Amino acid sequence: MSETPYTATYYVLPAWNEEIALGKVLSDLRTVDPLGHIIVVDDASCDETIKAGESGGACVLPMVAQLGPWGAMQAGMRYAAEKGCWRVITMDADGQHLPSQIARLTDAMNQTDANVVIGACSERGSFLRKFAWNIMKLFSGISAEDLTSGFRLYDRRAIALLVGEEASYLEHQDMGVLARLLGNGMKVVEVDVEMHPRVSGTSRIFNSWPKVLWYMLQTLLLSVSKRRVERVNLEKYKAASAHD
């Protein structure tokens, strides 16, 4: 049976200087879903990320100016929404998120009727990242295990909330996005997944104390201003796949 626009899953991968890792990520993704709609959003890279994406068979959206992690993600989600997507899976292009774990996200959504599933790996991350997580959890009241994971599955209702103008003012795919989702009654669950260290490069945020402190200041201000919205516990869902 042919796939209609409203049964199609799109994969959105923001990429900034990821020419080294991107080819392997796309190859592994094609192995899992040979007919998948893959969108690589090149966030004004200085290397051959665009070429790597095109060589891997992805639809590459080149940004003329750097939008940042969430801006690039939202651009890809808007493109998918315009194409009539059913679901969107967001992944990093640096090799951390494994296509082999996608089934755990889809199983969790199918079994819980969640609007959003977060692929969580609480064991990952540097001291800086874990320090930031603990502070954000303390002030926001959100008990997610992995607040900053970009490995997520969104349904059409969640996508509609995140492609709007109000969501454009967010900086990162974590607290602000969760606040918007939870504040609009979306059901968000987590599922444990395996992750690998990034293949190359460093995090745009969690690579120095000044960047982490600036990120935390932005996030904490958002947490305080949205506190009544964010004081919701995410459901921790352990996927019990028959394939495990």
Stretch-by-stretch model annotation:
Residues 8-10, 176:
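Cell-envelope/extracellular polymer assembly enzymes that use nucleotide-activated donors
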Residues 10-14, 62:
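Short hydrophobic beta-strand elements that form part
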Residues 17-31:
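Short, well-formed alpha-helical segments that are part of the catalytic scaffolds
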Residues 42-50, 95:
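A conserved acidic beta->alpha catalytic loop
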Residues 50-82:
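Conserved donor nucleotide-binding strand/loop of the catalytic core
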Residues 72-73, 77, 124-237:
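Conserved catalytic loops of nucleotide-sugar-dependent glycosyltransferases that act on lipid-linked
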Residues 85-96:
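Short beta-strand-to-loop acidic/aromatic patch adjacent to the donor-nucleotide binding site
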Residues 103-126:
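Conserved donor NDP-sugar-binding/catalytic core segment of glycosyltransferases
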